[in-house]
Amino acid sequence: MKKLLNTLNVTSENSNWGLEGETIVVYDNQTEIGRLPLHNLEGIVSFGYRGTSPALMGACAERNISICYLSPQGKFLARVSGKTRGNVLLREQQYKSCKDEDISLKIAKNCILGKVYNARWILERSLRDHEMQIDSERVKKASLQLKDALELIQNAESKEQLRGYEGEAASIYFGVFNELILQQKKDFIFSGRNKRPPLDNVNAMLSFVYTLLTNQIASALETVGLDPYVGYLHTDRPGRVSLALDLIEEFRAVYADRFVLSLINKKIVNGKNFSRKENGAVLMDDDLRKKVLVEWQNKKKEVITHPFLKEKVEWGMLPYVQAMLLARYLRGDLDGYPVFLWK
């Protein structure tokens, strides 16, 4: 099993990074602010427009350490990775399966089943743990509607139909998402999912964390030899990691959404670290981004029992595990893709 390594998150907009021997050196306005050995890294995420030296970029490419460039607010800009990994036969099988309507629909259906199942689990968990603090009737109704949606998704006959059911389920889930916010309700009001740009504090955090998780999944897919740009549900588009967007679906509720809710309900974050632009976009400040990144790294180290493998695994390893299971299915080692169903 692959070992969980660190991700270097560079949040200073004025930083540059260089290479000294086997060590990354980070500079802020020509002042050294940190060092980290290459062998401890699986990726670098830069929140700024400055860059890395050619020597460091080459060293990262040789070691399969991906470099992801984001804007200061977390908008994806670019990814740099090394040589294509894995068996070329695996990618050939991936491309072939994407063109096969039956196989493609089967995999896409599993991803959405995982998404809705896990979203319903979040609601059921809230009913169990916080029934007296939430509008339990609304949440129970939404949970039952998601249960019905699972049957519709299972019987979907086309991707168009599947996307329709997915959209309806997402609307139901996010329709009661505000009930799951138990603390700081004045600062964290959620009235619906919005993005590009996010229009409230909760959506700003969700979009930020979704970007982190998408990058994590894309790196995992490349590690096992799959092409992250060729998906089953999300159509191919230049520069879009479609397969990573497929696999993130099963993780959104139990990994990303739950993480954001935890930050709010445990009062790890507050409403003071957000600002609003003239166009209504809500932005996170540097201090908040750093705090979220620290908590994200801690979350990745938490250990759970994988529901399919029945083995202990860190949350941060789940994208790699699911990518590996998808690769095994495409090779013919498994009868189906075992989507992550949290229990």
Question: PLM features: residue spans?
Answer:
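Active-site helix-to-loop segments that bind/position phosphate- or nucleotide-bearing substrates
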Residues: M1-E20, Y27-N29, R35, L89-Y229, ...
